[in-house]
Amino acid sequence: MAREFSLAKTRNIGIMAHVDAGKTTTTERILYYTGKIHKIGETHEGASQMDWMEQEQERGITITSAATTAQWNGHRVNIIDTPGHVDFTIEVQRSLRVLDGAVTVLDSQSGVEPQTETVWRQATEYGVPRIVFANKMDKIGADFLYSVSTLHDRLQANAHPIQLPIGAEDDFRGIIDLIKMKAEIYTNDLGTDILEEDIPAEYVDQANEYREKLIEAVAETDEDLMMKYLEGEEITNDELKAAIRRATINVEFFPVLCGSAFKNKGVQLMLDAVIDYLPSPLDIPAIKGINPDTGEEETRPASDEAPFAALAFKIMTDPFVGRLTFIRVYSGILQSGSYVMNTSKGKRERIGRILQMHANSRQEIEQVYAGDIAAAIGLKDTTTGDSLTDEKAKVILESIEVPEPVIQLMVEPKTKADQDKMAIGLQKLAEEDPTFRVETNPETGETVISGMGELHLDVLVDRLKREHKVEANVGAPQVSYRETFRAATQARGFFKRQSGGKGQFGDVWIEFTPNEEGKGFEFENAIVGGVVPREFIPAVEKGLEESMANGVLAGYPMVDIKAKLYDGSYHDVDSSETAFKIAASLALKEAAKTAQPTILEPMMLVTITVPEENLGDVMGHVTARRGRVDGMEAHGNTQIVRAYVPLAEMFGYATTLRSATQGRGTFMMVFDHYEDVPKSVQEEIIKKNSGEA
């Protein structure tokens, strides 16, 4: 089958937003207007097309990024619907990694909200061009220009309206296009009948003012346009659109649109903007990777003629076809039935069938081309972030960074008979979601699961029950603490046992220094002259890794430490890998005496929104929970407080806030960084873990 849409007519976009901004409804409307669905499903009725997991339909939130393909004005638009809840950050991150552009949906009453900030920051890190859709213009309190101001104040974004609303709340009836300088008036409930007419007289001054501001803002990113603007020459609509497109693709400018997806207004114009201003695969730089054989950097251009290269960005288990691997093809063509190389794992894989996904229905296709997104069946060893390439032109693409889990709980099956079933179910869920970890406590034999938050683990335990038919008892949530060293030190690990039979001998000197936050454990071999033979060096590193997994203070994993092996000795007969592993672990224990070991705890960025009269209560809550206020902002009669608070102190906060504000206060929290635990709290943790408390 020949290529249906050229690369220039392909768009890979994500829809991202804060939870409840109306993102899934917006995606639904896109599917409706592009002819993919015939009846609109409402999120609050639990019938949405993109939210296809049972829990998503019950909770009215999007958990997994469903990928779907639609068509608009002769273009193919691949859409990934991403979750807005902070516990599902990895879903947002991995979709951003494979997108070319995104639509950020705002609730026009609230403007930029905490999760909007998180996904905006991630999109900026990945260099993803964005347009902004101020949704819910029909809602009480909707304020388009306030929403635009929050883009400037909270995100420092160079964002400017290319549209203005006509009316607001119940009176929202149309949109002014600041490029064409025309009004689009909606005349029916489905938003399919639109009248284009002159701008109503009462809006003409405002429209002229904002068109002038738009031209000025765009001209600042474009020298030719700036010259014309300064010389007072007329700027044509085509010139303005071309300049907006260039600036948007270069992530220098963010066009802002408005509408109400629920009331079917503004979605078609937003689709036009996706085509007009967001990039095709040809507009973005060729993807870079490393050739595993030479270690050299290579690029793969968006072209069907280039060798095949793709990134696996999501694994899902489908009840009918089994394991699906979602891939973004960057270059070349992939045929069903062909073999590819998983360069991340160094394994050859066979592509069984290729499916084009539409929410939860699918169409089988023979091949997938550069710039497209599809799901492959038959890949056994491929996991999230793996590169798949032509066997003759191998390259490893940049992977997807996975954040560390911050919360954990103990799970056990309700019946002993379910033990094996639970293990298999948890393993399958962990394959789909890299931020979900499953471990067995070596001392107690208990199964411990870790993730990004309480909702994240709730949903996974729920899926265990629904999809794998395992009823589980769940323990209370626990914080995922870490340990580290705060001072540099040198330590010797000496292990010798020579009583009867073969002896054991290992002797190492290791220098330990604190590493930068987030860099993890780094091992350096600085042995000169073979005082520790080369074959025992890996055993020293492994010995350190194994003992660091259980910490030196309270049994928590150790992070961000550099270890340099610089001296030691060995015995011709008695030295072994085991002896050097033990010697390394003894060196770590010895180092702990002088390296100022400390426990680290996850700090959450908490955003609390409360009525003005409850501000004092909230400040008290933050202080009582060992938190510190980072900033405050007034919005009408409500106050928004941003604070850093340890996760350990946030359990049960929802109840406290609810009773203090009679249910009118809300809060959101997102993991921000790890920080040293105060000494007094540290002592309590150590006591508790040693069984004294």
Swiss-Prot record:
User: Where would you find this protein in the cell?
Assistant: Cytoplasm
Gene encoding the protein: fusA
Q: Which PROSITE patterns match?
A: G_TR_1 (PS00301), G_TR_2 (PS51722)
Residue span(s) of domain tr-type G: 8-282
* Location (main, coarse): cytoplasm
Task: State the protein's name.
Answer: Elongation factor G
Q: What does this protein do?
A: Catalyzes the GTP-dependent ribosomal translocation step during translation elongation. During this step, the ribosome changes from the pre-translocational (PRE) to the post-translocational (POST) state as the newly formed A-site-bound peptidyl-tRNA and P-site-bound deacylated tRNA move to the P and E sites, respectively. Catalyzes the coordinated movement of the two tRNA molecules, the mRNA and conformational changes in the ribosome.
Residues annotated for GTP binding in this entry: 17-24, 81-85, 135-138
GO CC annotation terms, alphabetical? cytoplasm
Q: Which InterPro entries match?
A: EFG_II (IPR041095), EFG_III (IPR009022), EFG_III/V (IPR035647), EFG_IV (IPR047872), EFG_V (IPR035649), EFG_V-like (IPR000640), EFTu-like_2 (IPR004161), G_TR_CS (IPR031157)
Q: Which domain of life is it from?
A: Bacteria
Keyword list, A-Z: Cytoplasm, Elongation factor, GTP-binding, Nucleotide-binding, Protein biosynthesis
What organism does this protein naturally occur in? Streptococcus thermophilus (strain ATCC BAA-250 / LMG 18311)
